Amino acid sequence: MIAKLTGLLEEVGEGWLILDVKGVGYLIFCSQKTIDKAPKKFSELSLFIETHIREDHFHLYGFNSLKEQQWFKILISVQG
């Protein structure tokens, strides 16, 4: 699993960003809070990563803090 990524912030969209790590661009889904705290484009950024694998997709979710990541894990574990 990927636990953390550090690279250059290449692109930012609504709910996502692309982090370039040594020439590989990772599409990472993020909260608006995480995006708002991100530095300007082409600056270094580190994110804690939660990998979500399903039959039909492979998603990376990025967080500024481990606490925010833990809350995400709680939310996705709730049944119903």
Would you name each region that the model predicts?
Residues 11-80:
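Long, highly charged, low-complexity intrinsically disordered interaction regions
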